[in-house]
Amino acid sequence: MVAVLTIAAVVGLSSAGGAALAGFLVTSTDRLGVSTSAGVSGVSGTPTASSPPETPSPAASLPVPDTTETPVAEPVAPEPEPAPPPVSPADTPCDTGVTMSVWAHYDDDLLFMNPRLLEAFDAGRCVRTVFLTGSDAGRGEHYAKGRELGILRAYNTMRGAQGFWAEHSVTLNSGVEISQWSPEDDPDITVVFLRLPDGALNGGGFRATGFVTLPALVSGALASLAPIDGGTPLTLDALTSSLSELIVAYRVDQLYTHVPQGTEWAGGDHPDHSATGTVTRAAWQAIGFPADRVSYAVGYRTQDLPANLSGDLLARKVDAFRVYAAQDSVVSCASAQACLAKPKFGAWLQRQYAKT
């Protein structure tokens, strides 16, 4: 007897329209298993002595489905989408591009990344500037407050409008409290003060603030650092996450800061500068901010490079610095000529070098 094996695939959809389930039917047909009661060629169906009695063959069987189901793996539930981060209390909409910069001291932006800032103002961009230290130079909070006033007045000069500024104390999702200032007539401009202690030219700080510094915090030598006005101490993680939060909250598409530690142009710069550049780099990298939208300002070493500013841009840069310096008793200069004549400051004013 020759058995013929027939295999047919069965495909179906689940009631939910999910993936197809596949099984197989196996059937067997006996080709010689069909007989008649009349025998063959008129020969009687009654058995004779010379032939053995025939055993009736069973009728051909119908295909019987194989009811054994092929094991099917349980569907794997997709991973849930991560919850979106909470909206920052510092969330600030802007209808144009946003230039954010992060600096150590209250004049670093005016000296080392201008006229880039002037160009941002001229283009109608939103400008958000963050200062990490109180720029107190060990001289106390009164001196620091004067420098803050100088910065706000310099920004009035750069934006081409005079007016009062309003302060908003904001506690970020990171837990860090910031002092956020904007002109009453222009929310597109924001200046943020964190007021951490000035680290001094040698990075060792000042007796007045207990010799605690931002470079020590960034290096891990210090667990936390308190603002000079008595706020809650910040850890390095809190500072980094705060900057990341502000980059997102401000919808930044252009970021400026100091040259980070360990890079070619960090040598010879103020330790607060390179520490600020380092923590800012960690902040933008943590959120995947595009590296090609970040520029690092060369600091003190610009004085050794060729002067590259002149004409109207230089005049406007010097004018903004002059307005600031009127509130800074250390670098005060009453005219453009006097500012340009100041050792080191005059050289920095005539230069701007940015690295990527």
Regions found by a protein language model. Name each.
Residues G138-G146, E264-H273:
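Short, flexible/disordered intra-domain loops and linkers
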